[in-house]
């Protein structure tokens, strides 16, 4: 149903919604985008509830809320979209409780359909070695190999990588300070090949970087490299190195996670390395099979092992 086809809501339903929108704006200070999203979700649900007989919010019980879930499934909505709807409804009903207009929140006992978790695609160790066997020695190629070694060697998100400044890197200790999701700071470790190639890049960085630029990785224009540039260059290297599957920054992070868990018995440690808030997010990489996991970072990561001086 399009917005302009919607029938006006009864005052008993519309007025509490308007008070909630004002609350989101004045007291919660949410962005306009988030406010619009709440409004769209709530008004879509309320239109449906009116059609099936709701006239006042005090009528709403868990059976009505389950109807909303079933309606979403009939419409072919993703489980995550239904969960977003339910979250919006819970927030609104909590507001009504806060105002003394409801006694309990009927949406709190209703769950969205379980989201089907698909296993992330990753490269195996041989494919990673093939991708990273970059022999070109120009500054851009060395930068690109340093980026790929670091993303795979530390399991970084793309946003984390491009936001790294020179001051965040302790090369000798193999440590980097990154800002992850939710603006949370964490320390990541890198060793072996990643440490070696970041060091090579740092020696050449001044050939490309503007004098005032603080970013670790810069573009050929001398400024901080963009997300899109990293994605494009990785895809190009995948083709050049004849790797069968499409290469993306996310795939390198997935490969880091999978390879670490295949060689390590420490799910919590890998959770910390990835910056996952919830361990369930990390568990997806285990294929629900923990029997073959063994031990942690320097011993586990195939490119973190230091070369023997006699090699």
Curated annotation (Swiss-Prot):
The keyword DNA-binding belongs to this UniProt entry's keyword annotation: yes
Disulfide bonds: none
Main location: cytoplasm
SUPFAM superfamilies xref list: DNA breaking-rejoining enzymes, lambda integrase-like, N-terminal domain
Keywords: Cell cycle, Cell division, Chromosome partition, Cytoplasm, DNA integration, DNA recombination, DNA-binding
Boundaries of every Tyr recombinase domain copy: 118-298
GO cellular component: cytoplasm; Holliday junction resolvase complex
Localisation per UniProt entry: Cytoplasm
Active-site residues annotated for this sequence: 157, 181, 250, 253, 276, 285 (o-(3'-phospho-dna)-tyrosine intermediate)
Keyword Cytoplasm applies: yes
An MF annotation (GO) of this entry: tyrosine-based site-specific recombinase activity
Domain Core-binding (CB), first and last residues per copy: 11-97
InterPro entries registered for this protein in UniProt: CB, DNA_brk_join_enz, Integrase-like_cat_sf, Integrase_catalytic, Integrase_recombinase_N, Integrase_SAM-like_N, Recomb_XerC, Tyrosine_recombinase_XerC/XerD
Entry's Gene Ontology BP terms: cell division; chromosome segregation; DNA recombination; DNA transposition; resolution of DNA recombination intermediates
Chain's role: Site-specific tyrosine recombinase, which acts by catalyzing the cutting and rejoining of the recombining DNA molecules. The XerC-XerD complex is essential to convert dimers of the bacterial chromosome into monomers to permit their segregation at cell division. It also contributes to the segregational stability of plasmids.
Anything else known: During infection by the bacteriophage CTX-phi, it is required by the bacteriophage, which uses host XerC and XerD proteins to integrate the bacterial genome.
Similarity-based family: Belongs to the 'phage' integrase family. XerC subfamily.
Subunit comment: Forms a cyclic heterotetrameric complex composed of two molecules of XerC and two molecules of XerD.
Protein's name according to its UniProt entry: Tyrosine recombinase XerC
Organism: Vibrio cholerae serotype O1 (strain ATCC 39315 / El Tor Inaba N16961)
